[in-house]
């Protein structure tokens, strides 16, 4: 249970200026009483009130029995005793109320303060729960962001070799097109080769000359 200093710090403005009783600071049972315990404590604090009540009941019972027996004198004595017991009970109640007025006022303040502390504890628990949920949401968002970044890095790393290979293939195809001539183009004729062919045509066949279309040699004198 928090001490009186903490209680005063969280008390409302009307209660913070008043010192709280130190006899209840460390008494946890005072704050956790049920109805029977509360009545028992009140009886221990003001024992004259239950004594006066018991005396009143006893006097009334004695008067009833004397009336049944027909003893009128005893009936009168019991009624006077009942009145005296009731007066004693009233005096005990007034005296007890006056004697315990300050403590009861402090008890009311303590009960109000306890209710405020319970409400504040609930509010703090609610705030802490919201903070924990917010932290969990942020951690989840960070994990998802890291996963997205790693996936993007893996995709970029896997796509880089494919791009280089495509560029290499395109360069190789361009070079191949430049080296090879296109279909239907005639390669340039070598002039030395044409001169040799003309000389061979002028030589006779027995000297290695070429034959004509009809198989005859081309002899030119």
UniProtKB/Swiss-Prot annotation:
| Keyword terms | Coiled coil, Membrane, Mitochondrion, Transmembrane, Transmembrane helix
Quote a single Gene Ontology cellular component term: mitochondrial membrane
> Which parts form a coiled-coil structure per UniProt?
112-151
Query: A GO BP term, please?
Result: mitochondrial respirasome assembly
Cite the InterPro entries for this sequence.
Hypoxia_induced_domain, RCF1
Known PROSITE patterns for this protein?
HIG1
- Annotated transmembrane regions: 46-68, 83-102
UniProt feature, compositional bias: Low complexity:
9-23, 157-173
Q: Where is this region: Disordered?
A: 1-29, 144-221
Q: So which domain of life are we looking at?
A: Eukaryota
Q: Where is the HIG1 domain?
A: 20-111
Indicate where this protein resides in the cell.
Mitochondrion membrane
Principal subcellular localisation of the protein: mitochondrion
* Pfam families named in the record: HIG_1_N (PF04588)
- Tell me the membrane topology, using the record's own terms: Multi-pass membrane protein
Subunit (UniProt)? Associates with the respiratory chain complex III/complex IV supercomplex.
What is the purpose of this protein?
Answer: Cytochrome c oxidase subunit which plays a role in assembly of respiratory supercomplexes.
The UniProt entry's sequence similarity note says: Belongs to the RCF1 family.
Name of the protein this chain belongs to: Respiratory supercomplex factor 1, mitochondrial
Gene symbol of the encoding locus: rcf1
């Amino acid at each position: 249970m928090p001490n009186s200093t903490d209680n005063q710090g969280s008390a409302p403005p009307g209660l913070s200026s008043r010192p709280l009783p130190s006899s209840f600071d460390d008494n946890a049972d005072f704050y956790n009483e049920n109805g029977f315990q509360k009545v028992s404590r009140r009886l221990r604090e003001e024992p004259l009130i239950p004594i006066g009540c018991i005396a009143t009941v006893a006097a009334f019972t004695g008067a009833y029995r004397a009336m049944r027996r027909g003893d009128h004198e005893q009936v009168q004595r019991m009624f006077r005793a009942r009145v005296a017991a009731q007066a004693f009970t009233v005096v005990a109640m007034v005296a007890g109320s006056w004697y315990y007025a300050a403590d009861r006022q402090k008890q009311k303040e303590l009960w109000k303060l306890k209710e405020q502390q319970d409400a504040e504890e609930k509010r703090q628990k609610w705030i802490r729960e919201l903070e924990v949920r917010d932290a969990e949401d942020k951690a989840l968002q960070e994990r998802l962001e890291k996963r997205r970044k790693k996936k993007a890095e893996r995709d970029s790393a896997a796509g880089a070799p494919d791009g280089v290979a495509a560029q290499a293939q395109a360069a190789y195809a361009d070079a191949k097109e430049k080296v090879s001539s296109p279909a239907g183009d005639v390669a340039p004729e070598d002039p030395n080769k044409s001169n040799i062919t003309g000389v061979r045509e002028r030589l006779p066949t027995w000297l290695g000359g070429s034959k004509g279309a009809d198989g005859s040699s081309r002899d030119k004198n």
